[in-house]
């Protein structure tokens, strides 16, 4: 398949989100119903879309967050202060099912890494945190994310997501390549 002509941009209120279908009901519902509300009304996250032509083929929602130094992987704790540290949190990420398997998930993550570097230079950021669903853990692990310690809890019949972390230093090294 030829290389897709893709672009990234922030979600706009007028964007038609109804035709996007990742095959995951929860992600599709979030994108179609809540991404705009969270961005334009509540201001708790920003959704960026991946477009080919006028078609939305993927999205990522990010927000600012914090992490305690003791929750970081041991190799990321060196010389950090003992108070909550700023991170960029990936809240949701999905690719339209017609475009899955083409490497667009990696491209949208690389875009998010640029956002994390921008956050670092403007406000501070020690890394990126994601709560990976069971089926996505290997995807994030291959990209260098490390598992975080988790609290044991109950979510009913839903599997518990795995918190994972990628340090800003690792992101800087990857972007330079």
Q: Model segments located where?
A:
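Short amphipathic alpha-helix that is part of the acyltransferase structural core
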Residues: 1-41
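Conserved beta-hairpin
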Residues: 44-64
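Conserved acyl-donor/pantetheine-binding loop and adjacent beta-alpha core of acyl/acetyltransferases
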Residues: 59-92, 100, 154-157
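Conserved acetyl-CoA-binding loop-helix of GNAT-fold acetyltransferases
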Residues: 101-115
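Conserved GNAT acetyl-CoA-binding A-motif
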Residues: 109, 116-131
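C-terminal "cap" of GNAT-fold acetyltransferases
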Residues: 124-126, 131-134, 149-177
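Conserved active-site tyrosine of GNAT-family acetyltransferases
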Residues: 130, 140-141
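Conserved acetyl-CoA-binding loop of GNAT-fold acetyltransferases
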Residues: 141-150
